[in-house]
Design a protein with these regions (language model features):
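Short Asp/Glu-rich motifs
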Residues: 55, 130, 148-149
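Short, ordered loop/turn segments at secondary-structure junctions
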Residues: 123-124, 141
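Long, charge-dense
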Residues: 139-153
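Long, amphipathic alpha-helical surface segments
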Residues: 168-170
């Protein structure tokens, strides 16, 4: 029993970021959970995010739900129980930001309590998270991050950029700016022998 507690303790402290349900679903649909883990480290979710992404998704027959479940089983994503502190903070968020779902409030409160950056796409949720001091990360920057960190090739980064742009209906100007940044990094690496 003590060994299991020690393993759980190590796992909890190895999380590098948390992720909300909608961002996780987008990444699962794009088959890009591995890229997110490469960029941000092991991802933490709450039980309510698991409920929304895995159990509800499997009930509806969504393939992305199975991808998320496999990422949980493999340890890329860790499901965390929420304690009373998180429940109270989530309730406060829900009262002040009525547009947020319970799942959003839980993951924001979890991130705040654990001092983890939060991968989060929804604008309202980002504003609520940032208002309580949570660092937020947009998945729009994922293609740049994985290329800068050299965890993905230029070609894979371009594919991820294209997929994210389509999934999030990014304006072409934003997509072109990100593509230009990838091109410039590639050029600089070539100039520096890398």
């Amino acid at each position: 029993m003590e060994l299991l507690q020690n393993v759980a303790y190590v796992i909890i402290w190895s999380m590098n970021a948390a992720i909300d349900a909608s961002s996780l679903i987008v990444l699962a649909k794009l088959n890009a959970i591995q890229e997110a883990v490469d960029a941000y480290g092991v991802l933490g979710i709450t039980q309510s995010v698991e409920q929304e992404t895995v159990y509800a998704g499997k009930t509806r027959g969504y393939a992305d739900a199975h991808r998320i479940e496999m990422a949980i089983i493999s340890g890329q994503i860790i499901v965390n129980e929420i304690n009373n502190t998180i429940v109270k903070k989530a309730a406060e968020l829900r009262r002040s930001s009525t547009a947020l779902s319970e799942s959003d409030c839980h993951i924001i409160a979890f991130s705040a309590t654990k001092a983890l950056p939060l991968v989060l796409q929804d604008r309202r949720a980002r504003l609520a998270a940032e208002a309580i001091g949570v660092e937020t990360i947009s998945i729009v920057g994922l293609p740049l991050t994985i290329y800068i960190q050299a965890t993905a090739s230029y070609e894979r980064s371009i594919v991820v950029l294209s997929q994210i742009s389509k999934a999030l209906s990014l304006e072409s100007a934003i997509q072109k700016t990100l593509r230009s940044a990838l091109d410039e990094i590639k050029r600089l690496r070539k100039d520096n022998g890398g």
